[in-house]
């Protein structure tokens, strides 16, 4: 089992680091009480081999000793990596002023500036126990994400999952699509009596559509568009990209086009999924 502990001052980027870990498949728990680390790992044993927890000032004071004790008693075979994120007082003050969020220690009559300084003092012992110290003062969220991935994977490369989804316009448009293409102008197998009961997954329908120059040209143009912009989308720190293909009923044309695109992109470095909304609904 791999355990990652993320700690640091409020506003330094712990939530960004946790999102990166979540994208990498980690089961993430924010601000877990330190005495519960052992029981959490025990519960997840066998079902989740990647676990990440965040530890912040709300777990303190004096629980740094508890953390040492908990880490010393981790289950055998647990691979531990820990991060401490920090920023200068000036940067933290600016971030809190911009977001207008309440600092965890901004209670009673303690000013924001005093709360930031107090938190730094309280977390100092904990920061010295962490494996990796990252100063995020001059980092944006993408640069911080890259640093976390670099430490964990030895590379900043991020696997982008591409989902091709077919649907029927008469059943409503999908809300989660990043790109949407309307293929209702393509030749329709529905008007061929022998093809009407079939779907775009069936060979006779695939052969019919493959004979249509317009279909092949449109697929090629979508493929070319996506290949042109995928590198830029990846640099934008995306985890998923959903391309929706719609025809009238979501049975023939959209299914075929989505399948063809999925096959073409499966030959590359990305993880690719093809799903067919209306066909899945028909099975349910």
UniProtKB/Swiss-Prot annotation:
Q: Which UniProt keywords apply?
A: ATP-binding, GTP-binding, Nucleotide-binding
Report the superkingdom from the record.
Bacteria
For the ligand (ATP), the binding residues are 8-15
Q: Name one GO molecular function term.
A: GTP binding
Q: Hey, which family's this protein in?
A: Belongs to the RapZ-like family.
Free-text function comment from the UniProt entry: Displays ATPase and GTPase activities.
NCBIfam families per record:
PRK05416.1 (NF003828)
This chain's protein is named Nucleotide-binding protein Shewmr7_3352
